[in-house]
UniProtKB/Swiss-Prot annotation:
One Pfam family linked to the record: Ribosomal_L35p
Residue stretches spanning the membrane: none
One GO term describing the cellular component: cytosolic large ribosomal subunit
Gene3D superfamilies with a match to the protein in the record: 4.10.410.60
Family: Belongs to the bacterial ribosomal protein bL35 family.
Keywords linked to the UniProt accession: Ribonucleoprotein, Ribosomal protein
PROSITE patterns: RIBOSOMAL_L35
Any GO MF annotation of the entry: structural constituent of ribosome
Listed name of the protein: Large ribosomal subunit protein bL35
Amino acid sequence: MPKMKTHRGAAKRFKKTASGKFKAKNAFTRHILEKKSAKRKRQLRGTAVVAKEDTPKLKELLPYL
């Protein structure tokens, strides 16, 4: 059986936490920021934990992470 390959796009976007969850940067922070309130932009800073329903797919994409 050949080695499994890491999905490079996913590897750049997601990090695994010590408990096995995945975290990623929040969306909607790149452009069209003028109409977004300061509160909304502040809350979008940092990272978000990926939903548990999406975790099995990420484990497939990132087998060695």
